């Protein structure tokens, strides 16, 4: 596996963790922004998903929710999403979502540093 795909797979894993957390309302806003020790990559993933309009921030708990585009994205990749949630075919699932996320265009500009 080449290094760039390996890095994309790592980022993809964090993106999927963020998508899962958004659905389960299980994290604080600090976790999403990477303010929790050792979770800087989660902040990068949160920004990547926001820039693709798959999640949006909101006031109050939960700090993020799926957008209609995010819901459609997960529905379009339902089989792979279910495989991710059940931890089956982990590598194949991550490759699937790495390619799917790369094909999803960014619609928001980079946010200024917080």
Describe these PLM feature segments.
Residues 1-19, 108:
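Short alpha-helical segments that sit at the start of domains
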Residues 9-14, 35-37, 44, 78, ...:
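A composition-driven surface/loop motif
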Residues 17-24, 78:
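Short, locally clustered residues in the helix-turn-helix/winged-helix DNA-binding domain
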Residues 24-38:
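Short acidic, hydrophobic short linear motifs in intrinsically disordered regions
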Residues 35-52, 61:
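Short amphipathic alpha-helical interaction segments
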Residues 62-68:
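Minor-groove-contacting beta-hairpin "wing" of winged helix-turn-helix DNA-binding domains
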Residues 68-103:
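Short, amphipathic alpha-helical interaction segments positioned at domain boundaries
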């Amino acid at each position: 596996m080449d290094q760039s795909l390996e890095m994309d797979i790592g980022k993809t894993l964090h993106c999927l963790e963020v998508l899962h957390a958004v659905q389960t309302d299980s994290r604080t806003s600090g976790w999403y922004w990477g303010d929790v020790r050792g979770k800087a990559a989660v902040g990068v993933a949160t920004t990547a998903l926001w820039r693709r309009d798959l999640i949006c921030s909101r006031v109050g708990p939960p700090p993020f929710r799926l957008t209609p585009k995010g819901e459609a994205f997960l529905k379009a990749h339902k089989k792979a999403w279910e495989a991710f949630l059940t931890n089956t075919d982990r590598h194949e699932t991550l490759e699937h979502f790495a390619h799917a996320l790369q094909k999803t265009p960014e619609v928001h500009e980079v946010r200024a540093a917080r």
